[in-house]
Amino acid sequence: RGVRVTGTEIVGLVPKRALIEAGKYFLRKQRRSTGIAEQEIVRIAVRSMGLDDLKPFDPAEKVIEYLLEAEDKQKRLIDMTCKGFAEETASESPAPGGGSIAAYMGALGAALGTMVANLSSHKAGWDDRWEEFSDWADRGQALLGELLHLVDEDTAAFNRIMAVFAMPKSTDEEKAARSAALQEATLYATQVPLRTMKTAFGVFEIVRAM
């Protein structure tokens, strides 16, 4: 669908946003939906700009955000396999619980709506509607990303409350600090599922449109 740049090279590191914008630019030039997975957008940017023609281009080693994520050794639920996540939920650990599961179910709903939008964007006979479906897919990807984030955020909020219960309470000062921390942690633990509900509700608009 056009001439592709060959032999481009990036010296040093590159912000993820730059590759995302480049990938979406080339997708629009091809009249394709931009509401696809981030990794696929990056792959399209790399290929379209010829970043892997001169030598292999590994986004994990060249993109700033990916390097920072690799240095973060904290275990995330969303990095587990479906089987592993289910088994972790079934274990004797109190987390992940219903909040994380609800966020993941919402993410799957957003993923399904986004899938239909992407399929529709290049369906034969609907060529003049590709931008409409691309916009729906973009919205679906945004909701999907937020709900996946909330999977871990809900468990993190629960763990904050558990951490407060471990705080000392021998003196009046310690009791006051513990009480204040518990109030703050409990408030946040209610705000996260509220965000999940609001975000998941937004998925219905996409599903209805599809």
Each language-model region and where it sits:
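Short amphipathic alpha-helical segments and their helix-coil junctions
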Residues: 81-92, 201-210
